[in-house]
Amino acid sequence: MTNIESKHGIVSRQPYELYMSFTDLSNLAKMLPEDKKEMVTADMDTLSATVQGFNIGVKVHQRVPYSRIELVDYGAPFAFHVVLHFEPAAENPYHTDFWIMVEADLNLMMKMMLSGKVKEALDKVVDGLVDASNGKMPEGFDVSKWAGQ
């Protein structure tokens, strides 16, 4: 198994607030730019997307309230497990130490091709959440479509 861990980011929201934003996977689809939404289908427990001609999906495996959400592959060409962590930040319990861990069953070639790109994408997600929690929204992001508002 290949293990990939994102950087940790301190999000300026309490763990329960951030956790609740991720409990319904359809919220993630709502945040996408309009030109990407047609490639994604989602409901409370599943999210599927077509990326560069490949279909890949996740479904919720376990929710641990205000602490962790575990996702597993769902119609993907390889097995993987994703864990979103929402822990109180050590220096401020009203902020969240957020990070993502991925465990994937990749052969050596796929590991060499994908590991760096997956790590980079995970770090961008963490950075985006940190920035958004501090009022810096990504270009093209429509706050009115976010269910957490």
Please identify what each model-predicted range represents.
Residues 1-41, 149:
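Hydrophobic ligand-binding cavity/cleft-lining segments
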Residues 4-6, 54-57, 78-83:
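Short, surface-exposed coil-to-beta transition loops
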Residues 8-12, 59, 85:
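Generic structural detector for well-ordered beta-strands
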Residues 18-22, 28, 47, 60, ...:
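Hydrophobic pocket/interface hotspot
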Residues 29-30, 38-77, 148-149:
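Glycine-rich portal/gate segments that line the openings of hydrophobic small-molecule binding cavities
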Residues 75-127, 131, 140:
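Beta-strand/loop substructures that line and gate deep hydrophobic ligand-binding cavities in soluble
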Residues 137-149:
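Short acidic DE-rich linear segments
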